[in-house]
Amino acid sequence: MHELALTKSLIDLVEREAKNQGFTKALEIRMKLGEYSGVIPEYILDLFPEASKGTAAEGAKLLFEQIPGRFRCAGCGYEGAVERREAKCPQCGGTALKMTGGREFFVDSLKVE
């Protein structure tokens, strides 16, 4: 379960920013999550309350925004979304696709006090 390591890293980031920016409490943590990142937000939501006790992240609201997957077709040059169950280019039907986006996982913003 890599979500535990991600949750700890998230809390470490908040603690580091609290020290650097001089805030005492994070109220809201907004994250961007790629459709193909493999991260399960519900696991982070379950782990976060216990893992963040006694830190600047304790009690913060976690918000996730999904970033859709993006692909480039080697056959026709199409760039964009592809139906998951199809796994082929919507323009030419080709299957030589390279993922160019959708694996991301990062903190987009912190609301603090």
Positions of the model-derived regions?
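Short, flexible, mixed-charge glycine/proline-rich loop motifs
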Residues: 61-68, 78-83
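Long, charged N-terminal interaction/targeting segments
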Residues: 1-59
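Long, charge-rich boundary regions
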Residues: 2, 29, 105-113
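Short cysteine-rich clusters marking metal-coordination/redox-active sites
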Residues: 73-76, 89-92
